[in-house]
């Protein structure tokens, strides 16, 4: 029994576009976003144990308090559970970076614990209460995320692109950015056309935006500098901020273009976290 080990990567969540539709009476905002999950992320391992324990390693472990971690909160969603688990998180994804790292961690742990304990997943209602964007992180296919994040649907796509992600270390807390939003930042509901190939995807994305970008740039002007440098790279089809920032990304048709852009940006921002990955395949 003690030799059982379950493990998984916990992928980053990238908002290819992010529209804020309006503010609800409960204070939350209604969103509309196309979400992709490049094969980059933290690593999670789970072992059977008498109690629930969490250990964190990796270059960012000191920035992540254990007591308030979403992983521990997620483990408590299994009602009337008497099982335990040793959970090991190797944390390498930037925190407060617009990549949904905490929500992705929680989603992966929910799936692994369900498998380890052979019990059903908690209700979607309970999962949403823990984190509005945890449900979309339960599946890594291309998805449209609406409502407060609890309304998700799969989007069919063909072909693949290469994504270059860059984070300069700025912390952009989501609640801070949303507090600065005004109706002038809101968008109307749109229809997503059939995405028959990567060309149609890029054409569609160019008609969209990230409604949080302008607000975040006012607080963190360095993000505008990052985006300007993405536009300087050869082959960049579109550049944008993910989520509430501060991570920015560029999409490329060829891996060689993304790698060349990575080398260029590393020269300009040598202390940044920067990764290349395939998406939409």
Regions found by a protein language model. Give the residues of each.
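DPxDG-like acidic metal-binding loop motif
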Residues: 71, 97-124, 136, 140
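Short glycine-rich phosphate-binding loop at a beta-alpha junction
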Residues: 240-242
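ATP-dependent small-molecule kinase catalytic core of the GHMP/sugar-kinase superfamily
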Residues: 2-36, 118-238, 251-281
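Short, well-ordered alpha-helices that flank and scaffold nucleotide-derived cofactor binding pockets
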Residues: 76, 111, 115, 263, ...
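ATP-binding N-lobe of GHMP and related small-molecule kinases
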Residues: 1-97, 115, 119, 157-159, ...
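Generic structural signal for hydrophobic residues
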Residues: 71-74, 109, 226, 261
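Conserved glycine-rich beta-strand-loop-beta hairpin in the small C-terminal domain of fold type I
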Residues: 245-248
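Charge-dense, low-complexity intrinsically disordered segments
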Residues: 61-65, 100, 217, 252
């Amino acid at each position: 029994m003690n030799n059982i080990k379950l493990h998984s990567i916990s992928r980053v969540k990238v908002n290819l576009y992010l529209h804020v539709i309006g503010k609800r009476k409960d204070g939350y905002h209604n969103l509309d976003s196309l979400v992709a999950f490049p094969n980059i992320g933290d690593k999670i391992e789970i072992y059977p144990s008498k109690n629930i324990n969490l250990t964190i390693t990796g270059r960012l472990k000191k920035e992540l308090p254990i007591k308030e971690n979403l992983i521990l909160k997620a483990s408590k969603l299994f009602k009337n559970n008497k099982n335990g688990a040793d959970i090991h998180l190797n944390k390498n994804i930037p925190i407060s970076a617009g990549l949904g790292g905490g929500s992705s961690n929680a989603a992966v742990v929910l799936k692994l614990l369900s498998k380890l304990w052979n019990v059903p997943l908690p209700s979607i209602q309970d999962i949403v209460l823990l984190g509005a964007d945890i449900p979309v992180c339960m599946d890594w296919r291309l998805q449209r995320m609406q409502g407060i994040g609890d309304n998700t649907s799969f989007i069919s796509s063909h072909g693949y692109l290469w994504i270059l992600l860059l984070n300069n270390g700025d912390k952009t807390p989501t609640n801070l950015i949303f507090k600065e939003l005004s109706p002038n930042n809101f968008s109307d509901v749109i229809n997503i056309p059939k995405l028959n190939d990567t060309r149609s995807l890029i054409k569609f994305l160019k008609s969209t935006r990230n409604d949080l970008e302008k607000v975040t740039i006012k607080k963190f002007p360095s993000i505008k500098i990052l985006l300007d440098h993405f536009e300087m790279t050869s082959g960049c089809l579109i550049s944008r901020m993910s989520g509430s920032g501060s991570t920015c990304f560029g999409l490329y048709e060829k891996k060689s273009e993304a790698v060349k852009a990575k080398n260029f940006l590393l020269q300009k921002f040598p202390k940044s976290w920067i990764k290349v990955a395939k998406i939409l395949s």
